[in-house]
Design a protein with these regions (language model features):
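Catalytic histidine-centered segment of alpha/beta-hydrolase-like enzymes
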Residues: 287-301
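Conserved alpha/beta-hydrolase
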Residues: 99-122
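Hydrolase active-site cap/lid region
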Residues: 172-227
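Conserved alpha/beta-hydrolase "acid-adjacent" motif
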Residues: 261-267
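Short beta-strand/loop motif that positions the catalytic acidic residue
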Residues: 247-248, 253-256
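N-terminal cap/lid segment of alpha/beta-hydrolase-fold proteins
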Residues: 38-74
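Alpha/beta-hydrolase active-site loop
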Residues: 127-150
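The serine-hydrolase catalytic nucleophile loop
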Residues: 87-99, 114, 266
Length: 316
């Protein structure tokens, strides 16, 4: 009987051990079967899609535009409209890479080439004629296109711009351009003061001489761009820094470079100071006006783009 009791005890111990192991295996297996978190709450990057198209400007010219957005986004997407600067293109300053990074983070991005094409074809000639007002109009056409063709959350619209485009973005934010309530603005080297472009053109005397030629000849060509009398007038008629108060306490991020001599860090800081709720990131790089953002590999680029993504995550 004693021997039988020992066997029973061993059998019970074995069954208990098996039961415990089975239970542990079951619990471990259940971990993989838990419901996934909502797709918009995960930190995993979205797969992205890109769409290239031309926007009709209504005057026989067209704006080359590209939208990049997250695939399979659940619900209306936040949107960031992107503006380049003087002489730039839709891919200037790393804008293409930034667009894809935004889309991976769950944000639609739309950017355009402000230099109009004479036909809706990529190899079509350019007019080399654009100014602040036409840039603003292009931005609004792009935003409205996105709203009309994609599911966009119009309560989560942001602006990103650099250099001359920075002044355009400041104006749009200040004035609720197009009736939109832009929620956040990020600027790299914004030419948004009353003297930023005067400085870029060589100072007051050079500015006045260029204006005179534009009046007499209809335009003056500078660095491949045709500057009309209206081009000069628009800079003189509206100083975005004077109206930053209209943006109230909505957030503005300004990035400047101590070695930038195209748009100086002093100019960038003046733009930041025009807003109640602004933050400045100051860098130092020999890539004076590019900020290394178009480099294939750059720690500075990665840092700045991460800061930009985080800024829009926090504020859109």
């Amino acid at each position: 009987m004693k021997s039988s009791g020992k066997h029973i005890h061993k059998a019970l111990s074995f069954l208990l051990a098996v039961t415990m192991i089975t239970g542990l295996l079951f619990i471990s297996g259940c971990g993989n079967d838990m419901p996934a978190a909502d797709g918009n709450d995960t930190d995993a990057p979205y797969k992205t899609a890109a769409e290239e198209f031309f926007l009709d400007r209504g005057d026989g010219t067209y704006t080359l535009t590209e939208a990049v957005y997250p695939k399979d986004y659940d619900g209306p997407m936040p949107l960031v409209a992107i503006a380049h600067g003087f002489k730039g293109t839709l891919n200037s300053g790393g804008a293409e890479e930034l667009s894809h990074r935004l889309a991976e983070a769950g944000y639609a991005a739309v950017r355009m080439d402000f230099n109009p094409s004479i036909a809706p074809k990529k190899n079509a000639d350019k007019t080399n004629l654009y100014d602040l007002k036409s840039m603003e109009a292009d931005m609004l056409r792009a935003v409205n296109y996105m709203i009309g063709h994609h599911s966009i959350d119009t309560d989560r619209l942001g602006l990103y711009a650099r250099s001359m485009g920075g002044g355009v973005a400041m104006t749009m934010a200040n004035e609720n351009s197009g009736g939109f309530d832009f929620k956040a603005v990020a600027l790299v080297a914004p030419a948004g003061t009353d003297d930023a472009m005067v400085y870029y053109m060589g100072g007051d005397e050079s500015w006045e001489e260029m204006k005179k030629t534009a009046r007499e000849d209809g335009f003056i060509e500078h660095q491949g761009q045709k500057l009309t009398p209206e081009w000069f007038k628009e800079f003189e008629d509206y100083n975005p820094c004077d109206f930053g108060y209209k943006f109230a306490d909505k957030p503005v991020l300004v990035i400047c470079n101590t070695l930038d001599y195209v748009v100086t860090d002093e100019t960038s800081r003046k733009c930041a100071a025009a807003y109640k709720n602004s933050r400045v990131i100051e860098v130092t790089t020999d890539n004076y006006h590019g900020y290394e953002m178009s480099y294939e590999n750059s720690e500075l680029k990665d840092y700045l783009m991460s800061e930009l993504i985080d800024f829009f995550k926090d504020n859109l």
